[in-house]
A protein has these predicted regions:
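Charged, terminal alpha-helix-loop-beta segments
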Residues: 1-145
Length: 145
């Protein structure tokens, strides 16, 4: 594993790695720090949480987010890392992606975002401003759907 360092003008320290205690801990970190997800792409967009624990006909999505390019992001968190489990998770996410648009057709996504902001103590105005920085609200949700 590569090391991660904390570097300041007068200090250089290797950060210790630590396993997550539970799936929920990792799931909560992706909610609290969605900017970590933007490190995985070339986009500078910070994803916005639509909702966590979203029930659909094929299961339950751990975290459902969207970036400011109107690209949906589905997160499924698993504790262990092995080849068979990775295959299962990929299949699970493909099932979710194929059914989500039909299952959530009645969902008011902006209301869900506001509800999630309140649940997790985020500034809903700042979150929505971030979300709509590239498109007007109506255009954004048209692209999203």
């Amino acid at each position: 594993m590569d090391n991660i360092y904390n570097i300041s003008s007068d200090n250089f320290k290797t950060l210790d790695s630590k396993l997550f205690e539970s799936e929920k801990e990792l799931q909560n970190l992706t909610i609290k720090y969605p900017e970590l997800l933007s490190l995985l792409s070339e986009s500078e967009s910070i994803p916005v949480l639509i909702s966590d624990e979203v029930r659909i006909s094929t299961g339950r999505i751990d975290n459902f987010l969207v970036d400011n390019e109107a690209i949906p992001i589905l997160i499924e968190v698993k504790e262990r890392s092995n080849v068979e489990l990775k295959r299962k998770v990929v299949g699970q996410l493909l099932d979710y992606a194929s059914t989500i648009s039909n299952d959530l057709i009645e969902m008011n996504f902006e209301e869900e975002i506001i509800s999630s902001c309140r649940k997790h103590s985020f500034d809903e105005n700042a979150v929505l401003d971030n979300l709509y920085q590239n498109y007007e609200k109506e255009e954004f949700w048209e692209i999203f759907s």
